[in-house]
């Protein structure tokens, strides 16, 4: 199949019903057979590298976003194929090796994507095309599972939005699409989360020179926010000012990033930046962003 690039609303609408997901977990062998962090990958430098080729970034499928647990021992990501739609996969570091990616229990039957683990490691949020409770806003909708003594709880509805991100202080950010049918645009918003439920949205005063912001990624220390435009391309960063306002967005394509890159997320320590490009996940040293503070 041909690689897909990023995702759009029409793409996500096509992921509602899944059939035969087994092919999406194809891997060489039963475990990755590696003992290093980040699924055994050597950390990248200042030039982007393909992340975990053959394990996460697979030539036969499309991968877009993922999330690491705060201690780095778990990784969740989603994979898409033309035949089977989208499934949420995870790998764990167990007894010195990373396990082969497998589907998250309880999510089969509906497209699942854009996972995010909270910094307290107690909640896993993911967009899911499962029907929402009566009277609640629907697509795109987030659901959450709470960590238990034996794994994860049953999924529960969280609220509407796309591409959740959070920092160490427990502040969450999301793509607010609640008025899209009225103004045909998206917003980046701070969202209050209580017991896995989205209770309030506060739109941020961040506006790129063109397009509408989406897919926010807050840094672990909350000092900068990455986002993209045009449905998953053209990455920008906005640095937080001392007074708490957000600075003018910086176009990362002016600093060497491919304009087709989008869907950014960071390692829990902020050392590495991940992003989607041409249907795969790439990563690069996070200082490429930090170094822009002195320039911009």
Task: Give, region by region, the residue ranges found by the protein language model.
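Residue-level recognition of alpha-helix boundary/capping or hinge positions
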Residues: 6, 21-28
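Short, conserved micro-motifs composed of acidic
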Residues: 27-296
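Bacterial N-terminal signal peptides
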Residues: 10-20
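Bacterial N-terminal signal peptides that target proteins for export
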Residues: 1-11
């Amino acid at each position: 199949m041909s690689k897909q690039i990023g995702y759009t609303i029409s793409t996500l609408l096509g992921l509602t019903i899944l059939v035969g997901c087994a092919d999406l977990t194809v891997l060489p062998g039963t475990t990755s057979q590696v003992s290093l962090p980040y699924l055994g990958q050597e950390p990248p430098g200042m030039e982007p590298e393909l992340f975990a080729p053959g394990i996460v970034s697979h030539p036969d499928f499309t991968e877009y976003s993922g999330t690491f647990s705060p201690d780095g021992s778990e990784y969740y990501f989603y994979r898409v194929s033309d035949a089977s739609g989208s499934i949420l996969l995870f790998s764990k570091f167990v007894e010195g090796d990373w396990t082969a990616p497998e589907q998250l229990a309880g999510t089969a039957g509906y497209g699942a994507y854009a996972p995010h683990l909270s910094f307290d490691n107690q909640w896993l949020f993911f967009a899911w095309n499962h029907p929402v409770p009566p009277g609640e806003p629907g697509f795109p909708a987030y659901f959450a599972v709470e960590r238990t003594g034996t794994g994860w709880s049953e999924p529960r509805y969280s609220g509407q939005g796309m591409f959740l991100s959070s920092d160490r202080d427990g502040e969450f950010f999301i793509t607010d699409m609640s008025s899209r049918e009225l103004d045909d645009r998206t917003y980046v918003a701070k969202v209050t989360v209580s017991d896995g439920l989205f209770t309030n949205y506060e739109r941020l005063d961040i506006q790129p020179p063109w397009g509408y912001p989406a897919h926010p990624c807050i840094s672990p220390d909350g000092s900068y926010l990455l986002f993209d435009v045009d449905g998953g391309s053209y990455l920008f960063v906005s640095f937080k000012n001392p007074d708490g306002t957000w600075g003018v967005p910086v176009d990362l394509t002016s600093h060497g990033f491919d304009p087709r890159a989008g869907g950014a997320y960071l390692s829990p320590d902020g050392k590495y930046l991940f992003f989607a490009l041409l249907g795969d996940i790439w990563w690069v040293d996070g200082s490429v962003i930090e170094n822009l503070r002195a320039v911009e």
